[in-house]
Amino acid sequence: VNGAGKSTHVGACVDWLRAQGETVVLSREPGGSPLAERLRELLLTEEMQPQTEALLAFAARSDHLHTLIRPALAAGQWVVCDRFTDSTFAYQGGGSDVDTSWLAQLEAHVQDGLQPVRTYLFDLPPEVAAARRAAVRSADRFEARALDYFERVRRAYQARVAADPERFCVLDATATPEQIGRWLQDDLVKVHRRWRERAASPTGAADKAGARPS
């Protein structure tokens, strides 16, 4: 959720990985490619039905994957992405009650099995996130929605964590930025070590086109 401080920590992840000698691509969703950025502008500014939001999000994601993410992974690079598919399940599925089985079908078609190795969820009560956002900028059309919408969004994120706990690392975003940064780096060190060990294994070459953390 915007206001949780994730963008700051995403940059710290990229800096740490580059310090380890990794080539890192930093991206975001919606967006990440020229076409996806144009779709992002529509999503954030134009009123539309929730199903239309979901379709635009997956259209942007499809182009993002084709244009940036898959080529980077195939080249052995890391991709760090500020938001990905979990946000569509949370905002459109949880917040706007779009059928999650339909979203899962779109996910399967667009991603063809590609998933992040690691997903960091910055968990924050909606009222705290709203107060933080109000202190720094005007709201887009999603951020302007009522607190009960963001309660549903938060529950949807929690459901995603429960369904795939090995992929997620949940961080208490009410903590200080310094503490969150320490938690994040401690986990990223482990993720990076596991990846290095896997890449060095006899089967590692076959894994080089796999997903990196998002």
Describe every region a protein language model picked out:
Residues 7:
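Walker A/P-loop
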Residues 88-155, 159:
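A glycine- and Lys/Arg-enriched "phosphate-lid" helix/loop adjacent to the NTP-binding pocket
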